[in-house]
Amino acid sequence: MCEPRGHKDMVGALLVEPISKEADIGVIYMDANRWINMCGYATIGVSMTLVNENLVKVVEPVTHLILEMAAGLIHVDVEVEDGKTKSVSFENIPSFLFEENCLVNNIHFDISYSGSFFALVDADQLDIEININNANKFKELGVNLLRQINEKYDVKHPTLPINRVVNVEFYHKTDDGQKNIVISEEGIIDRSPCGTGTCAKLAYMYNTNKLKLNEIFINQRFTGVSFKGRVIEETKIDKYKAIIP
């Protein structure tokens, strides 16, 4: 992903023939270090590209797509005007709170799944402001924290071969939602508020009675870009109370 005009924080998408007959197209996500089960902001980008380049049948005002990826089938709605994308929303795979009130080195966090496992850390306990000047501090802290989490906690999806916490979201509460910075275990700083991470946060908030069904949650990256998310229904994954975000 670093050549010819890439960089270490970039996510790429390999478009392939789907296995599922329901899907319009298959997507294999990757970054500069590994394959990725699911990426929310890349799903938005792929869907925009498919519509804007007429790689799928475009229907106005909304083009419906089903993308198949390692995490499962993702249903996407692309709002279209004059043949171009205006906005993108997607229905993610079932997401759930795996474990709450975890602790490593006096840092409290919760673990949620939404295509990948995320550690969710309230940054108020760290006394570090979430801003661009502290990005490298969070990067170093995040990489070390994820290593220790995976050494201490036995994290396993009940039905899929996914068994690592690969991202950490540090967040502050704001007046209308939350502000965050997301770090991967390789030290990649997410360029967006993180779509998959937003779904993980929805699962945590819903299961801890901090968010209601269909209530809009605004998740903002430290640069000001924001995603909106909501819980559209409840479901269950093995023993876990899950949601469809």
Segment roles from a protein language model:
Residues 115:
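Glycine-rich ThDP/TPP pyrophosphate-binding loop and its adjacent helix/strand module
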Residues 1-103, 108-110, 123-245:
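A glycine-rich beta-to-alpha transition motif near the start of alpha/beta enzyme domains, typified by
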Residues 118-119:
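Glycine-rich phosphate-binding loop plus the immediately following alpha-helix
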